[in-house]
UniProtKB/Swiss-Prot annotation:
Coiled coil: none annotated. Residues 259-270, 277-287, 348-358, 438-448 have a biased composition (Basic and acidic residues). The lineage of its organism: Eukaryota, Viridiplantae, Streptophyta, Embryophyta, Tracheophyta. GO terms for cellular component: protein-containing complex. GO terms for molecular function: chromatin binding; RNA binding. SUPFAM superfamilies: RNA-binding domain, RBD. This is Protein ANTI-SILENCING 1. GO terms for biological process: epigenetic regulation of gene expression; gene silencing by siRNA-directed DNA methylation; transposable element silencing by heterochromatin formation. Residues 486-569 form the RRM domain. Residues 302-315 have a biased composition (Polar residues). Disulfide bonds: none annotated. Collaboratively with AIPP1/EDM3 and EDM2, the AAE complex regulates alternative RNA processing (e.g. alternative splicing) and epigenetic silencing (e.g. H3K9me2) of intronic heterochromatin-containing genes as well as genic heterochromatin-containing genes by promoting distal 3' polyadenylation; may associate with intronic heterochromatin and bind gene transcripts to modulate polyadenylation. Required to prevent promoter DNA hypermethylation and transcriptional silencing of some transgenes. Residues 38-169 form the BAH domain. It comes from Arabidopsis thaliana.
């Protein structure tokens, strides 16, 4: 059974399952997978970008010898690669090695660093063909056509333990039988010519180099290569099997590999435009494939990276244009309102507006009169009338509205009316990028250029419908929503709003269903500012609403902006029985008495108090001895004075 998943915006799909491993049987092995439109199987040769040198055009070459996924989604999908060495990577050890071809590589063998290691699946950048031209009797000899079309060839191995080039290849390398490393037998089923041509056009079987890791570094995501995070009897990997260049905390790039047809879009767009049917298209593709295969390997690589480099320059120029547009929008925001409207009105007067086909007004139950304020022709065509600023109008109904989509530099006025009361909300620049959904990504250019919109707020479609099941109490709903992260706190509301009106404003202005509850005012709250708690269905919707209100500005009728943030609810604690007193529970007292450790109330030699007491006693003894010696000396001096003293009579 195949399993489809999404990996960073690229198409990914598992292929045939192979077996289950791990101590807990939580590791699933696979024989193949499809990544970014290319199918990868066991023992296919792939290219892996070198993140330590982003500008380098020399990726690493490896053979897939194991594919697996852990049941824990936090652990990424893994592949084990058996490495090939290019002559430039082992140049110091090639002295005395004869007849080294230009596109020759050396198979890693032996035991030690550089044999094989575990990588993330997203580090693979593309497929390549590595052909074995060894005269070993175990190796099926390739044809001249395969030899000419191969990207790389190998006939010798490099022993990573002794760092020597050997001519013999072992029966098993990194636990893989050598028959899977040699060329496939001719008796195996091969794809037809048309299938091979289609695979070549789609960039599956003959795509030489990925366009991502070397020419489009900005589109790739950097992945640090680590050994297997889990060890089991079936999936234990040799964590020391890494290249010397890759072992020291290196990175590899998971890239978006473009197809071969995209590489040659600038070159062959004219010729391919006339071949869409039948044999003409097939013959044209065959010519292009034969021409490409006849080129040397180095030239094909250089052409591939030149094409990808041109796309990089084009993307850089496109980003520069976007930066210029952002600067102009920032400059326009800093201008006074009157001057900005005066400059915009000249360009807006001649611009046609997209209108919705709607007749008159729609009356909703419970006395809500909902009117969509738009000028609509009977045949549904666009009205090319001039756009007039709302400030020049007496009533709101005369302002031409548009679709409910939020674009930068656009004012949205929402009127909530029930009976005779009317409340207005204005939204400016809700979003810098209309990328919150696929529908919003497909907005037309007219939607991106409109600067003002007025719409009448109506009740939600399901506001008056009866419900079969009773809803949960508000407290339970709040607790469940807080666990999911879908509770949003709206501030700066009008305190006179009701919960239903807040829900209607969110539905009309932000086009989202929610459940709202106004927070009751107390003696410590500000009487002029209201707050409401809003529960959305999912966390993504809540984040989208907060992002819109944060990047843009939703103004109320009083001119105050509406502020939204995630709410953290703290339930009130249990009040004490006596105000100002803390009561100790009997259970806590009993627990403390039970867990108390018997201790002595006097000083013991094993504590700090004993040492301090001994030091104090020493100082006290010294003081007493000094005082006693001073007293004795004083008495002796007094006795001597009395003896020598003679009373003088008058």
């Amino acid at each position: 059974m195949e399993e489809s998943v999404a990996s960073e915006g690229l198409e990914f799909k598992w292929g045939k399952k192979k077996g289950v491993g791990g101590k807990k049987k939580d590791v699933q092995f696979y024989e193949s997978f499809t990544y970014d439109g290319d199918e990868y199987r066991l023992y296919d040769c792939v290219l892996v970008g070198n993140a330590s040198e982003p500008d380098s055009t020399e990726p690493f070459i490896g053979m897939i010898i194991k594919i697996w996924e852990h049941a824990n989604k936090h652990i990424p999908k893994k592949v084990k690669l058996l490495w090939f060495f290019k002559p430039s990577e082992i140049a110091p050890y090639l002295e005395g090695v004869p007849n080294v071809l230009a596109n020759e590589v050396f198979l890693a063998s032996g035991e030690g660093l550089g044999l094989a290691n575990t990588n993330q699946l997203e580090a693979i950048g593309g497929k390549c063909s590595v052909l074995c031209i060894s005269k070993d009797k175990r190796n099926p000899q390739p044809s001249d056509e395969k030899f000419n079309s191969a990207d790389f060839v190998f006939c010798r191995a490099f022993d990573v333990g002794s760092c020597k080039v050997v001519d013999t290849i072992d029966d098993k390398i990194a636990g893989v039988d050598v028959k899977f490393i040699f060329n496939r037998a001719c008796s195996e089923k091969e794809a037809t010519a048309v299938q091979n041509i289609e695979a070549d056009v789609n960039g599956k079987s003959d795509s030489l180099k990925p366009n991502g890791p070397l020419a489009r570094g900005a589109s790739g995501s950097v992945r640090k290569i680590e050994d297997s995070a889990f060890e089991s009897s079936d999936c234990k990997e040799n964590s020391n099997g890494c290249k010397e260049e890759k072992e020291k905390g290196h990175y590899q790039l998971a890239i978006k590999k473009s197809t071969l047809a995209e590489e040659r879009s600038n070159k062959d767009s004219g010729s391919r435009g006339n071949h869409y049917n039948g044999k003409d298209q097939e013959s044209e593709v065959k010519k292009q494939l034969t021409k490409q295969k006849s080129m040397p390997g180095e030239e094909r690589y250089s052409n591939s990276f030149e094409a990808s480099g041109s796309r990089t320059i084009h993307s850089i120029s496109k980003k520069a244009q976007e930066n210029d547009v952002k600067k102009q929008l920032t400059k326009q925001k800093s201008m006074p309102a009157g001057e900005r409207y005066s400059q915009e009105s000249s360009g807006l007067d001649d611009r046609p507006l997209k209108k919705q086909k709607l007749d008159g007004s729609v009356t909703v139950r419970d006395g809500w009169d909902t009117t969509i304020l738009q000028n609509i022709t009977s045949d549904g065509k666009k009205d090319t009338g001039s756009f007039k600023r709302p400030r020049d109008k007496v009533t709101i109904e005369e302002v031409p509205p548009e679709k409910r989509s939020f674009v930068k530099n656009r004012d949205l006025v929402v009127s909530v009316s029930e009976g005779k009361t009317t409340k207005t909300v204005t939204e400016k620049g809700i979003s810098k990028k209309p990328s919150f959904g696929r529908a919003e990504d497909k907005m037309s250019a007219d939607d991106n250029e409109r600067n003002y919109q007025v719409t009448e707020v109506c009740r939600r479609p399901d506001a008056g419908k009866s419900k079969w099941f009773r809803s949960l109490p508000w407290e339970e709903s709040m607790r469940e929503a807080e666990k999911k992260g879908t509770v949003v706190l709206l501030q700066n509301l009008d305190p006179t709003y009701t919960s239903d009106e807040v829900e209607d404003i969110v539905y009309s202005a932000l086009n989202q269903q929610c459940e709202a509850r106004m927070i009751e005012r107390t003696s410590v709250t500000i009487p002029h500012i209201g707050e409401a708690l809003v529960i959305f269905k999912t966390r993504e919707v809540a984040e989208r609403v907060i992002r819109r209100l944060d990047e843009g500005c939703l103004l109320l009728s009083s001119g105050r902006p509406l502020v939204a943030s995630f709410a953290k609810i703290t339930p009130p604690g249990k009040p004490s029985l006596f105000s100002g007193h803390i009561k100790l529970h009997k259970t806590q007292t009993r627990r403390e008495m039970r867990d108390a450790v018997a201790t002595s109330h006097s000083s013991q030699p094993n504590n700090l108090e004993f040492d301090m007491a001994m030091e104090w006693c020493l100082h006290q003894a010294r003081h007493e001895q000094a005082s006693e010696s001073v007293s004795k000396r004083q008495l002796e001096e007094m006795k001597s004075l009395r003896i020598n003293f003679k009373l003088k009579l008058p």
